């Protein structure tokens, strides 16, 4: 049986941002590496404890999605993402690719929409998602 893990990368980035907010990890250059450390640690723990056969991390695209077209006020009251969150996206994707973990970002679709579609496609195919 396949053991598939689909992770919402943006949700985890925010989780790490808030987890380390009071005690950030900073490298020798003074750069905050908390998000990268926390996310990488979470992925390694997942791999070592769950032993997935498939693993993918999805991210929200930088442009608006179909939800904004359908409902123009979608996320209208949400404040902009913190700079640390924005700055973590590219290096985090590089780290994941270095681990040969599939990174998915589909224009027009948020990470959770991609996860929902993929889970629906795999449902019942001798998989544990």
Model-derived regions, located:
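Noncatalytic, basic helical substrate-engagement surface that gates or grips nucleic-acid strands
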Residues: 2-129
């Amino acid at each position: 049986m396949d053991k598939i893990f689909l992770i919402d990368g943006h949700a985890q980035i925010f989780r790490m941002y808030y987890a380390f907010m009071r005690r950030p990890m900073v490298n020798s250059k003074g750069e905050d590496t908390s998000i990268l450390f926390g996310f990488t640690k979470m992925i390694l723990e997942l791999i070592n404890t769950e032993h997935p056969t498939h693993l993918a991390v999805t991210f929200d695209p930088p442009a608006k999605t179909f939800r904004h077209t359908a409902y123009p006020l979608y996320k209208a009251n949400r404040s902009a993402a913190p700079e640390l969150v924005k700055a973590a996206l590219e290096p985090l994707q590089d780290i994941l690719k270095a681990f040969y973990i599939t990174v998915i970002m589909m224009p027009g679709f948020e990470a959770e929409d991609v996860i929902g579609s993929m889970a629906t496609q795999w449902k019942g195919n001798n998989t544990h998602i």
